[in-house]
A protein has these predicted regions:
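Residue-level signal for beta-strand positions within conserved beta-sheet cores that form or flank
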Residues: 130
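Conserved double-stranded beta-helix
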Residues: 149, 154-158
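Noncatalytic nucleic-acid binding interfaces
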Residues: 134
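Anionic group-transfer/hydrolysis microenvironments
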Residues: 138
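Left-handed beta-helix
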Residues: 1-91, 96-115, 122-123, 127, ...
Length: 158
């Protein structure tokens, strides 16, 4: 509840809520810069990231683990890759996943899961006509988006 505020600016997005007086003296760019200096991760990273194969949403980030929701579009797949610093655990919550792990293929349906150890070559593919949803739990000392060594990529990324 707000009392005695005649004019407010209210901006609501999926990952943030801004409520401020409609005052010409307030500099939004400067406020965001100040949040960046304090290492506020909401300023640095948007929770939903789009990729050629679909998207992922960061649900939770802590020091040694991170939880993401992956959406793999129909007939798409991620690159064949491995990670130097993290392990992953995938849980299928919607659809069917075709997972490659160290040259072996696993077909997973809803409520099935698989562990991807650090250093294992892996890929997930959605061969279906509907989106595939996976919850990914990453664990490790370093959880970096650029911790990817690609071996094959249909989208020609390095």
């Amino acid at each position: 509840m707000v009392i005695n505020k005649k004019y407010l600016i209210i901006i609501s997005t999926k990952d943030a809520l801004l409520v401020m007086p409609n005052d010409k003296n307030i500099n939004i760019k400067e406020s965001i810069k100040n949040l960046s200096k304090k290492n506020n991760e909401k300023v640095q990273y948007h929770p939903t990231v789009y990729r050629p194969w679909g998207s992922f949403e960061i649900l939770l980030t802590k020091k040694n683990y991170q939880v993401k929701k992956l959406i793999i579009n129909p007939k798409q797949k991620i690159s064949l890759q491995k990670h130097k610093y993290r392990s992953e655990h995938w849980i299928v919550v919607k659809g069917r996943a075709c997972v490659t792990k160290n040259n072996k293929t696993y077909n997973l349906k809803k409520n099935h899961s698989i562990d991807i150890p650090k250093g294992a070559k892996h890929r997930v593919e959605n061969k279906e006509k509907t989106p595939l949803t996976i919850i990914e739990i990453q664990t490790g000392d370093k959880l970096l988006e650029n911790d990817i060594i690609r071996f094959e990529d249909v989208y020609n990324r390095n």
